[in-house]
């Protein structure tokens, strides 16, 4: 039988594989903690030593997801992980980048412009589900297949 890992060693193993928010790390460690106090001590130590950073997690998350998802969805996902709204707002991509991402996502999913209203609504729902706001959705639907429109955000 393997010896039990300490909570600190488990946290180190988890963070060596992926960036996590404090809440995410707490969720993973909670079943292995003997007490809430022990868990909080480990989380505080890791935060003080900058081994776990909510800011670093938010940056990595946004960098990996911003090409496929809009600001609304990114903000919601970060809020679920305990990242405060101000940090999220500061890290989110600017409007022009988001519009270009929406166009890229739309072109990848739908190979041609909407032929009728039903198809246009389907495309709009797809972008809204991905977390793009109404203005971005309208811009993407209008300009996704324009050859001349590059960065006219």
Curated annotation (Swiss-Prot):
Principal location class: cytoplasm
One GO cellular-component annotation of the UniProt record comes to:
cytoplasm
* Role of this protein: Modulates RecA activity.
**Any one Gene Ontology biological process term?**
regulation of DNA repair
From the Swiss-Prot or TrEMBL record, give the protein name: Regulatory protein RecX
Q: Which organism is it from?
A: Neisseria meningitidis serogroup A / serotype 4A (strain DSM 15465 / Z2491)
Q: Which family does it belong to?
A: Belongs to the RecX family.
Pfam families on file: RecX_HTH2, RecX_HTH3
Q: State the InterPro entries in the record.
A: RecX_HTH_2nd (IPR053924), RecX_HTH_3rd (IPR053925), Regulatory_RecX (IPR003783), WH-like_DNA-bd_sf (IPR036388)
Q: Which UniProt keywords apply?
A: Cytoplasm
NCBIfam families reported for this sequence: PRK00117.2-5
Subcellular location per UniProt equals:
Cytoplasm
- According to the UniProt entry, where is the signal peptide? none
Gene coding for it? recX
